[in-house]
Amino acid sequence: MSYQKHQQKWQLPAKCLPKYPSKWTPQAPASCPAPCPPPAPSCCVSSCCISGFGGHCSLVSLRFPRFYLRQPQHSDCCEHESSRCSTCYSSGDCS
């Protein structure tokens, strides 16, 4: 028996095969959130979190550290705001 005849003998009828929608693909569903952006440098994160001014990262936090350290630090806000920091300075400030 040749290979082709053997293959045809064991093929299942089309009605036995599972029916998937034509658009079905093994990719992740569209409801998945977009991947997170890369984290900003730590100097920006700490400065933004302490100052509370987001991307502006005021030097006020360096001049009055006790006042700003008492403020609640929200990690979700820090992650969102620190993404605006493009340049970090040795003082911990960013712009």
Curated annotation (Swiss-Prot):
Q: Does the keyword Metal-binding feature in the UniProt annotation?
A: no
Superkingdom of this entry's organism? Eukaryota
Which keywords accompany this UniProt record? Keratinization
GO biological process, alphabetically ordered:
keratinization
Name the protein family: Belongs to the LCE family.
Q: What does this protein do?
A: Precursors of the cornified envelope of the stratum corneum.
- What name has this protein been given in UniProt? Late cornified envelope protein 7A
Query: From what organism does this protein derive?
Result: Homo sapiens
Gene encoding the protein = LCE7A
